[in-house]
Amino acid sequence: MSTSFENKATNRGVITFTISQDKIKPALDQAFNKIKKDLNAPGFRKGHMPRPVFNQRFGEEVLYEEALNIVLPAAYEGAVAELELDVVAQPKIDVVSMEKGQEWTLTAEVVTKPEVKLGDYKDLTVEVEASKEVTDEEVDAKVERERNNLAELVVKEDAAVEGDTVVIDFVGSVDGVEFDGGKGDNFSLELGSGQFIPGFEEQLVGAKAGDTVEVNVTFPENYQAEDLAGKAAKFVTTVHEVKAKEVPELDDELAKDIDEEVETLDELKAKYRKELEASKEAAYDDALEGAAIELAVENAEIVELPEEMVHDEVHRSVNEFMASMQRQGISPDMYFQLTGTSQEDLHKQHEAEADKRVKTNLVIEAIAKAEGFEASDDEIEKEINDLAAEYSMPVEQVRSLLSADMLKHDIVMKKAVEVITSSAKAK
């Protein structure tokens, strides 16, 4: 196979490559065997037409397209490898010549990975807004959240105030006509929770059990049900009960109810302080790492980022997001209906970060290359075992899902990130 590459523009060019007859002939045989089972010819049983008869009747050229589909992937990948090109995105393949008995010549318009000119990426000094310090107020707030989780709702006679829970029936209508989803019975609503559309909960403050309140609201313009968006609605609401939240006393008994491993409130606070310190330490390290990587990317120069790389990243990100939604039982149609968005909106949302992620990956890859990082067999094996433990999967299943090249790439990328972050300091 002969190959050549011609630059056409920055990060773009054309590969010309040939496919020899010793590769074409087996591909033609495969193509014939694939289609002959459906062939009928006088004097032959279906699927048993001899190759010479086929060639005489239809011509060998009929097999070329199928044969090319068989032989092309390996031929193209071989040309890319021989030319040592780092290709991104799908190529545009064109046939130059496909003559009987001759080698086939093809071209591939390709986009290549852009050149990265690294700037400073070691000993960086960065701004980190996160703090490692844990305050008494943060500890008290965590105790208070757990205390509220143990609160009980007690029926009261007085009028409802914000924070109370009301048990209601409601019937909604627009222009006097009831609408789907606008009716509820014995619904528990915490006033001030924001569960209902703006303005609804506020109008129930002051209501008592037995009251009927006419709640008038306007649906938001971006409401997910388009037929209701921006429209004025009336909800006839009957209050059955008003319940106040009663929280337990803040004492040692509460501490033991929250966490059976402690005996006193002071012990609970000390435990929460340690947990918060560990959490804030991790958040600080993440913030330092993120800021250092961001600065390393800013310090680098990327020569004309191909738009195809960004488009591919957007599609990858969107597909990953939708797969995550479906694992939660939310179909694409359901997601778009609930959020009042479209496929186009979702792509636009992901475009904002796609450009940044592509640039970041390119710079980290360039650092790994500059540092000469490689992945040993032992490191690959450790990575497989770590992933198996993290996702509770059999080691062999992880090995079958991830190629050695993917694992090597992940390992050297982690090493490059470590180079950036290990020497970074906060201002």
From Swiss-Prot:
GO terms for cellular component: cytoplasm. Keywords: Cell cycle, Cell division, Chaperone, Cytoplasm, Isomerase, Rotamase. Residues 163-248 form the PPIase FKBP-type domain. PROSITE patterns: FKBP_PPIASE. Transmembrane segments: none annotated. GO terms for biological process: 'de novo' cotranslational protein folding; cell division; chaperone-mediated protein folding; protein transport; protein unfolding. It is found in: Cytoplasm. Its EC number is 5.2.1.8. It catalyses: [protein]-peptidylproline (omega=180) = [protein]-peptidylproline (omega=0). It holds the Pfam family FKBP_C. Its main location: cytoplasm. Gene3D superfamilies: 3.10.50.40, Trigger factor ribosome-binding domain, Trigger factor, C-terminal domain. It is an enzyme of class 5 (isomerase). GO terms for molecular function: peptidyl-prolyl cis-trans isomerase activity; protein folding chaperone; ribosome binding. Involved in protein export. Acts as a chaperone by maintaining the newly synthesized protein in an open conformation. Functions as a peptidyl-prolyl cis-trans isomerase. Consists of 3 domains; the N-terminus binds the ribosome, the middle domain has PPIase activity, while the C-terminus has intrinsic chaperone activity on its own. Belongs to the FKBP-type PPIase family. Tig subfamily. This is Trigger factor. It comes from Streptococcus equi subsp. zooepidemicus (strain H70). The lineage of its organism: Bacteria, Bacillati, Bacillota, Bacilli, Lactobacillales.
